């Protein structure tokens, strides 16, 4: 069960839950953010010690409400699930999110990307993934000591923390769970559910035609 975690922030300093920036610049970017975030939520649904969030402000330093950023998706291992207005590291056992994703849009500027890269490198992110849906391009970084190092070939890469595999073709990008199932959009999941229900209904009709009641155990 999800709960809202209590706040233990020192009085006198305000840590806003919003930074005034839009959640996404276009529908394609938003679709990918939701697909990645919800796919990871589903993947770790039985792990109470894995917290996944989208567009949540992360404050790494107590007493400093200016140093902050909001990853499109973050994953923090060793932290309980629950509702948060922001991710304040000093209230999270000193644990920084280990994995972050950014989904680019035409509005993303180089300066903003550089700022975020330096932020993630400085504050302990282990894996950093940047996907550009317009160019169908993936850039991946992995921590080596104190720095984030770019992975030369991200296609086929398996995330050490998440256990997911990234597959790039000329015109598509797929994230595959450890079971090989692709992360899907809500529409794709709904369509799959409807197809399964249709098959189940047809099977039930065949059983009834044979004089078997499928509703009886």
Which residues make up each language-model segment?
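A structured, charge-rich N-terminal accessory region that forms the first stable segment of a protein
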Residues: 25, 30-43, 51
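A generic secondary-structure signal marking the coil-to-beta-strand transition
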Residues: 32, 48-50, 71-72, 97
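C-terminal interaction segment
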Residues: 2-25, 42, 58-71, 76-123, ...
């Amino acid at each position: 069960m999800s709960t809202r975690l209590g706040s233990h922030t020192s009085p006198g300093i305000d840590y806003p839950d919003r930074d005034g920036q839009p959640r996404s610049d276009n529908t394609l970017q938003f679709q990918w953010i939701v697909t990645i975030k919800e796919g990871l939520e589903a993947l770790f649904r039985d792990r109470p010690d894995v917290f996944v969030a989208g567009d949540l402000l992360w404050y790494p330093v107590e007493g400093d409400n200016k140093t902050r950023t909001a990853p499109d998706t973050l994953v923090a291992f060793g932290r309980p699930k629950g509702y948060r207005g922001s991710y304040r590291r000093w209230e999270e056992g000193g644990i920084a999110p280990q994995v972050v994703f950014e989904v680019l849009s035409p509005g993303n500027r180089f300066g903003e990307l550089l700022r975020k890269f330096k932020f993630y490198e400085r504050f302990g992110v282990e894996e950093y993934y940047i996907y550009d849906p317009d160019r169908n391009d993936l850039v991946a970084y992995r921590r080596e000591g104190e720095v984030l190092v770019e992975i030369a070939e991200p296609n086929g890469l398996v995330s050490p923390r998440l256990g997911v595999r990234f597959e790039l073709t000329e015109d598509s990008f797929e994230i595959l769970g450890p079971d090989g199932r692709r992360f899907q959009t809500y529409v794709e999941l709904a369509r799959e559910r409807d197809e399964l229900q249709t098959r189940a209904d047809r099977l039930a009709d065949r059983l009834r035609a044979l004089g078997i009641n499928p509703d009886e155990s």
